[in-house]
């Protein structure tokens, strides 16, 4: 692997790690509601779009699949958990 590829990988890892940390904070917030979840979800999509577009755009596309099928009746903590499962899975393979 090239130095540039390694730098891109580290860049993506850092931002996904930050998303996971923010998501865990949201899950531990007893006031978490659907509006807060939607704000975090939009934020996570924007971060993934910016950080992965020159590395592997499929990361964002694959993220959109499970989040589009999240049952709206689930509690916000479960919704964040579904997103975190995907993000943690990405961290394991990059």
Regions inferred by a protein language model and the residue ranges of each:
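Charged interaction/catalytic cores of defense and host-pathogen modules
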Residues: 2-94
